[in-house]
């Protein structure tokens, strides 16, 4: 049983977050290890394993990038330990330029405002790539979706760097 089936959801990228959360709570309640306190050792172990699977499934499905990777894994495309790199020189150049721009934010006259503007730009870029990913997954364009996920991972790392710079400015 895959994660979507576990939660009674259609196997697709777009999902109803509130339905996912309510299904998660119901499954958590049903398979909580405390409910099996008087059960046999085997049943208690199975309950713990089931609870762990429910938690893993929820963490995967609630995160758009992890959900997309999981959808690809259902198609036989594994990205977790992949050695394939992104082959888009324009995108990679843009990422280098963005990182340089982020490094220069602290030297601006108003670094907080510069960081907010930079973050807004990166967030818009992230939304753009997520929309493209959604379309590619809906059209079963698995390899294009895999490339899009790679791009989104670069952007996620950049967003983490933005948070790091923000912490420096505030700290």
Swiss-Prot record:
One Pfam entry for this protein is HSCB_C
Protein name, entry field: Co-chaperone protein HscB homolog
Q: Which Gene3D superfamilies match?
A: DnaJ domain, HscB, C-terminal domain
Superkingdom of the source? Bacteria
Q: Which UniProt keywords apply?
A: Chaperone
Q: What does this protein do?
A: Co-chaperone involved in the maturation of iron-sulfur cluster-containing proteins. Seems to help targeting proteins to be folded toward HscA.
The answer on whether this UniProt entry bears the keyword Chaperone reads yes
Q: Which PROSITE patterns match?
A: DNAJ_2 (PS50076)
Underlying gene: hscB
Sequence ranges assigned to domain J in this UniProt record: 2-74
Subunit structure and binding partners: Interacts with HscA and stimulates its ATPase activity.
**What is one process in the GO biological process aspect for this record?**
protein folding
Q: Show the GO MF annotations.
A: ATPase activator activity; protein-folding chaperone binding
């Amino acid at each position: 049983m895959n994660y979507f089936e576990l939660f009674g959801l259609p196997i697709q990228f777009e999902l109803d977050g509130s339905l996912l959360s309510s299904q998660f709570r119901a499954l958590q309640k049903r398979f909580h290890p405390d409910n099996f306190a008087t059960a046999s050792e085997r049943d208690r172990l199975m309950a713990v394993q089931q609870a762990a699977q429910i938690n893993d499934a929820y963490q995967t499905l609630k995160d758009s990038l992890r959900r997309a990777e999981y959808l690809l894994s259902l198609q036989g495309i594994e990205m977790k330990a992949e050695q394939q790199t992104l082959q888009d020189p324009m995108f990679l150049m843009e990422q280098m330029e963005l990182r340089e721009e982020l490094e220069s934010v602290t030297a601006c006259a108003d670094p907080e405002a510069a960081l907010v503007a930079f973050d807004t730009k990166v967030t818009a870029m992230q939304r753009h790539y997520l929309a493209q990913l959604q379309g590619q997954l809906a059209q079963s364009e698995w390899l294009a979706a895999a490339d899009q996920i790679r791009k989104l991972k670069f952007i996620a790392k950049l967003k983490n760097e933005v948070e790091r710079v923000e912490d420096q400015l505030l700290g």
